[in-house]
Amino acid sequence: MVQILDGRSVSKKILQEVKDKVAKAGFPVKLATIYNEENEGSKMYVGMKIRRATFAGLISVEYKVDNSWKTDDILRLLSKLNMDSSICGILVQSPLGDGIDESKIFNAIDPLKDADGLSAFNQGLLFENAKENYIVPATPAGVISLLEAYHYQFAAKNALVVGRSVLFGRPMSVLLTNRDMTVTLAHSKTPVDQLRQFAKRADLIVVAIGKANWFQFTDLKKDVVVIDVGANKLNGHATGDVDFEKVYPHVSQISPVPGGVGPMTIATLIKHTFDLAVFQQGEQK
């Protein structure tokens, strides 16, 4: 029987754990979020994050930008937030707008306030497999937490990651490599015949290509686990990158869309913010 990897239930446990820790911490935990209020998708997603952050006991502060803002305007705002000792975590919701250099924005976030783990500093520590405290990009970290919640054994298995973005695919492949998996990183330019062969050999398949129902392969290992990171709209409905109905009968475990990786990303962001707050408290003593 196929098992659904329920990100909603796992994320609720993470949020409750954070809530309990915040209640005992004795100091406020504040998350600052920057987003473009003219982007409806960003408004909706930020609203979800703020509701869950509030549940977990965090203080949320919104900083709204619009299409008139330039990269330098946002950099000035970030500089103020970096210097504000009351801010524990900073989240920049992409996309910010046309012409905004988002790489420059992410790298301007103080690494000790980088709740999403997207700065070059934190990504560098990930690639180095550093042992000291650092923040892993939230979505890949959420995938790992989801798999761990279902007691997935990583070592000595084959993984296929489809999607090579700096925000997800590349850090995901490194996280799996650091857990002793043999990882193939494929992308939109990988020939379909090659991709089919990679999928056939994989024990774990993680798909983040940004196209609704794109992954439709069915010639898979009988015990394969499929993680769908897609967040698309199709006919008004949230749809993943994996054709769920087609692939479902051919796997042992699969994450749904919605209700899989999305809630895990949000819970991870909130956990990161608390972890950063604890670290900052130690630095101030």
From Swiss-Prot:
<keyword id="KW-0368">Histidine biosynthesis</keyword>
<dbReference type="GO" id="GO:0005829">
    <property type="term" value="C:cytosol"/>
</dbReference>
<dbReference type="GO" id="GO:0009086">
    <property type="term" value="P:methionine biosynthetic process"/>
</dbReference>
<dbReference type="Pfam" id="PF00763">
    <property type="entry name" value="THF_DHG_CYH"/>
</dbReference>
<comment type="pathway">
    <text>One-carbon metabolism; tetrahydrofolate interconversion.</text>
</comment>
<keyword id="KW-0521">NADP</keyword>
<keyword id="KW-0554">One-carbon metabolism</keyword>
<protein>
    <recommendedName>
        <fullName>Bifunctional protein FolD</fullName>
        <ecNumber>1.5.1.5</ecNumber>
        <ecNumber>3.5.4.9</ecNumber>
    </recommendedName>
</protein>
<feature type="binding site">
    <location>
        <position position="231"/>
    </location>
    <ligand>
        <name>NADP(+)</name>
    </ligand>
</feature>
<comment type="subunit">
    <text>Homodimer.</text>
</comment>
<dbReference type="InterPro" id="IPR046346">
    <property type="entry name" value="Aminoacid_DH-like_N_sf"/>
</dbReference>
<comment type="similarity">
    <text>Belongs to the tetrahydrofolate dehydrogenase/cyclohydrolase family.</text>
</comment>
<keyword id="KW-0028">Amino-acid biosynthesis</keyword>
<dbReference type="InterPro" id="IPR020631">
    <property type="entry name" value="THF_DH/CycHdrlase_NAD-bd_dom"/>
</dbReference>
<feature type="binding site">
    <location>
        <position position="188"/>
    </location>
    <ligand>
        <name>NADP(+)</name>
    </ligand>
</feature>
<keyword id="KW-0511">Multifunctional enzyme</keyword>
<keyword id="KW-0378">Hydrolase</keyword>
<dbReference type="GO" id="GO:0035999">
    <property type="term" value="P:tetrahydrofolate interconversion"/>
</dbReference>
<dbReference type="InterPro" id="IPR036291">
    <property type="entry name" value="NAD(P)-bd_dom_sf"/>
</dbReference>
<keyword id="KW-0560">Oxidoreductase</keyword>
<comment type="function">
    <text>Catalyzes the oxidation of 5,10-methylenetetrahydrofolate to 5,10-methenyltetrahydrofolate and then the hydrolysis of 5,10-methenyltetrahydrofolate to 10-formyltetrahydrofolate.</text>
</comment>
<dbReference type="GO" id="GO:0006164">
    <property type="term" value="P:purine nucleotide biosynthetic process"/>
</dbReference>
<keyword id="KW-0486">Methionine biosynthesis</keyword>
<dbReference type="InterPro" id="IPR000672">
    <property type="entry name" value="THF_DH/CycHdrlase"/>
</dbReference>
<dbReference type="InterPro" id="IPR020867">
    <property type="entry name" value="THF_DH/CycHdrlase_CS"/>
</dbReference>
<dbReference type="Pfam" id="PF02882">
    <property type="entry name" value="THF_DHG_CYH_C"/>
</dbReference>
<dbReference type="GO" id="GO:0000105">
    <property type="term" value="P:L-histidine biosynthetic process"/>
</dbReference>
<keyword id="KW-0658">Purine biosynthesis</keyword>
<dbReference type="GO" id="GO:0004477">
    <property type="term" value="F:methenyltetrahydrofolate cyclohydrolase activity"/>
</dbReference>
<dbReference type="GO" id="GO:0004488">
    <property type="term" value="F:methylenetetrahydrofolate dehydrogenase (NADP+) activity"/>
</dbReference>
<feature type="binding site">
    <location>
        <begin position="163"/>
        <end position="165"/>
    </location>
    <ligand>
        <name>NADP(+)</name>
    </ligand>
</feature>
<dbReference type="InterPro" id="IPR020630">
    <property type="entry name" value="THF_DH/CycHdrlase_cat_dom"/>
</dbReference>
